[in-house]
């Protein structure tokens, strides 16, 4: 369950692998909440997920063209699939940057994540009713590179973009606590390579002499190479068997919309929505940003 969740969270290139706060000289913070639902494929049971977390970071220009930044974060998520559930505490560190030359921009970033997982599987069979529990760790690593081109139409700023992202996840082995019905799982690894493209639109509106609002909209499509996670399980010393999880969607449509309020020359407050839709899957998130320029 967690390996599938880790890879699904690592999709969507720049949206997931770097902060959504504007690239600038300053410090910033971001709080977010998201919910997602994955429908059953007829074999594996459907799953729902909710997550809440925050990210903080700092960035700055090292030259006229280059900007580099660092960030860290924490996320708490819950996963539910029928009689199985898990709670996950995730810790994240990462770096990002950009290079701008005339109208062309190259944006890149990556992060490393450590996940502490507590899972529960309820067993109901004849006279047996058990809550099998396990605690184990997982890790994931993600990176992306994106190329964009800014087009100023005077009415709106357009940025067509295309990029590539890669994610790798590793889950440690585990053994549930109930001896009679306990499952054991071997450690497993999986990876996801994705290509994506889309367009961003933005415009700035003056509210007063010192206050303005920047509107942002993005639409995109992503193609994923990874399909279905698999895990080797066994009961006690019995022979192991392979269990397949929910397949990740090959093609995903996503949209973002946001407002950034420039409260002063150095401080901005932003609100953003992000949605992703694919066959049998939908994911929605709300984010709040606070940034202070140097």
Describe the role of every protein-language-model region.
Residues 27-28, 160-164, 215-220:
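Extended hydrophobic secondary-structure segments that form protein cores and membrane-embedded regions
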Residues 1, 42-50, 82-84, 116-137, ...:
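Solvent-exposed, glycine/polar-rich loop segments of beta-barrel outer-membrane systems
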Residues 66, 101-106, 150-159, 204-214, ...:
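Secondary-structure transition into beta-strands, especially the periplasmic turns and strand N-termini
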Residues 181-294:
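Outer membrane beta-barrel transmembrane domains
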